[in-house]
Amino acid sequence: MSIVLKIKRTEDAKDLPLPAYMSEGAAGMDLYANVKGEVTINPGEVELIPTGIQIELPPNYEAQIRPRSGLALNYGITLLNTPGTVDSDYRGEIKLIVINLGKQPVTIKRGQRIAQMVINQVVRPKIIEVEELSETERMDRGFGHTGV
């Protein structure tokens, strides 16, 4: 099934590429940093990085904003609220909460691929409050219950 994702560039991002899939099998399309020149993020610091795009999703869809694995592995750069969710009724610019978990300052340049966006269908269930839940073999055993 194919859907339409409408993308509008902000006035200051007309020179940046539209989000793009970098391979035939890529689940996420890359997003680009819409910074003026460069932004340096020191270890432990957080910066809000604009992408220069606004999107319109069909109803019952969301965009998940995720870190790029190469930036995380090589520089310690990731997103604080990952995955970030863009709801179908949001029309503002997508901005990224970027943190440097590495040991060295990292410079983000204008037009650099900084995150990826994955589009997913959303199911909104009917919510029913109950007194009991069905039993399972696992029940409430959580964190590490199958071993580490």
UniProtKB/Swiss-Prot annotation:
<dbReference type="InterPro" id="IPR029054">
    <property type="entry name" value="dUTPase-like"/>
</dbReference>
<comment type="function">
    <text>This enzyme is involved in nucleotide metabolism: it produces dUMP, the immediate precursor of thymidine nucleotides and it decreases the intracellular concentration of dUTP so that uracil cannot be incorporated into DNA.</text>
</comment>
<dbReference type="GO" id="GO:0000287">
    <property type="term" value="F:magnesium ion binding"/>
</dbReference>
<feature type="binding site">
    <location>
        <begin position="68"/>
        <end position="70"/>
    </location>
    <ligand>
        <name>substrate</name>
    </ligand>
</feature>
<comment type="similarity">
    <text>Belongs to the dUTPase family.</text>
</comment>
<dbReference type="Pfam" id="PF00692">
    <property type="entry name" value="dUTPase"/>
</dbReference>
<dbReference type="GO" id="GO:0046081">
    <property type="term" value="P:dUTP catabolic process"/>
</dbReference>
<dbReference type="InterPro" id="IPR008181">
    <property type="entry name" value="dUTPase"/>
</dbReference>
<keyword id="KW-0378">Hydrolase</keyword>
<dbReference type="InterPro" id="IPR036157">
    <property type="entry name" value="dUTPase-like_sf"/>
</dbReference>
<feature type="binding site">
    <location>
        <begin position="85"/>
        <end position="87"/>
    </location>
    <ligand>
        <name>substrate</name>
    </ligand>
</feature>
<comment type="pathway">
    <text>Pyrimidine metabolism; dUMP biosynthesis; dUMP from dCTP (dUTP route): step 2/2.</text>
</comment>
<keyword id="KW-0546">Nucleotide metabolism</keyword>
<protein>
    <recommendedName>
        <fullName>Deoxyuridine 5'-triphosphate nucleotidohydrolase</fullName>
        <ecNumber>3.6.1.23</ecNumber>
    </recommendedName>
</protein>
<dbReference type="GO" id="GO:0004170">
    <property type="term" value="F:dUTP diphosphatase activity"/>
</dbReference>
<dbReference type="InterPro" id="IPR033704">
    <property type="entry name" value="dUTPase_trimeric"/>
</dbReference>
<keyword id="KW-0479">Metal-binding</keyword>
<feature type="binding site">
    <location>
        <position position="95"/>
    </location>
    <ligand>
        <name>substrate</name>
    </ligand>
</feature>
<feature type="binding site">
    <location>
        <position position="81"/>
    </location>
    <ligand>
        <name>substrate</name>
    </ligand>
</feature>
<keyword id="KW-0460">Magnesium</keyword>
<dbReference type="GO" id="GO:0006226">
    <property type="term" value="P:dUMP biosynthetic process"/>
</dbReference>
